[in-house]
């Protein structure tokens, strides 16, 4: 999906020409948008993701052996991000036990149920898309963009947020602050905030 993608930051990363990236995202983008842009320029060496089926280029690179993939169930990946931000090095979860996704991982029984050990996720740089930021870096997200952005903001050693607007301190209701500014290192106002639609459907009149 493309909801909550910091498209301008992805474009800047592409234009930088940096190679050998390990990307953490719930998906691999689509052709021509999101992380699909970095796949086109062959800047990604490894993807940690939950779903990669929308991108034909990713499939080709994986089958060619030019990109590595680490698949995680979505809930597990979200918790790995949250653990990284909270300073929790690892946790046990029953999700995925006995499947190829967890082969080779430590397993233990709790209350008669098997669990596997998952480690926290950290990022050298977290690229985040938020709706608004105030001048102290407090972020608020719109609707489903409040998915993986908040936990990934906390899991980054450096967090850069692309926003649609920067407002004065106090303009965001405290109850609407989804990511406190303590986690945010840089704020960028994105240009040309076009909503990319994966499958545009219109009613025939």
Q: What is each of the regions a protein language model found here?
A:
Residues 1-205:
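Conserved alpha/beta enzyme-core scaffold
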